[in-house]
Amino acid sequence: RGLGDVYKRQPFVYFYLPDTPKKLKRLEKTDYRTFGNNGNSIITSRELRWFLRDIEDRRDAVLSLYEEEKREPLSFPIKLSAGADMEEIAAAIRNLLELTEDIQCKFRKPEVALSHCIRVLEKWDVLIFQATKIAPSEMRGLSIAYERMPIIALNRKDEPYARLFTLCHELVHIVTRTSGICNDVNENSVSQNVIGMKCNQIAGKILVPLNELSSHPTIGKIRKYGFDDSYVYQVSRDFAVILISF
């Protein structure tokens, strides 16, 4: 039992098996990335390996419950090419998330916007998990693009505004079926991963569409009186994003 606690193997009956259990093969479409969004990096954290196994097990459990209740999981409603126009992808995701300028103005806080987006996605049978024991430097978000019950995981150690951006970033991976683990979703990332950087750009367009930003009343004040932190705060509050995003 002590070894079970140390090696995170529960139940400890694993230690009485006649041989090492076979590892389940991961989906080929799942790109497990960790450091710098580098697909060649090796996952070394025990916590992250355990988390990956746990969320897959939880998905299997939910699928079993659906089967017992004779329910069919919903198919994820959007599938677009990774080469599709960024505005098209962003608009499709905003529509899926039921985001409009009026709705975003009511959020006021990123955590409220995040709860709204999670609630909408769960209606489509998207499984949302939040890691609590993994450093953001190792994983800020991950996605596994199953056609039914896709998985998105966020890092609870991140601030709500960061998790909101990560959620949108991972949604792009789901929509384009380019899932993976991301440790850096900062828009100024020097990552060479083209898809990851594109996901960052689209995530920004999901949260702050250029046409809505341009027509925001405060933008007129900035053009007339110059850039000021108070104006930036007004815009960031209305779009429920962090001030530094601007």
Model-derived segments and spans:
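Short juxta-domain linker segments that transition from a proline/glycine-rich
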Residues: R1, D5-F246
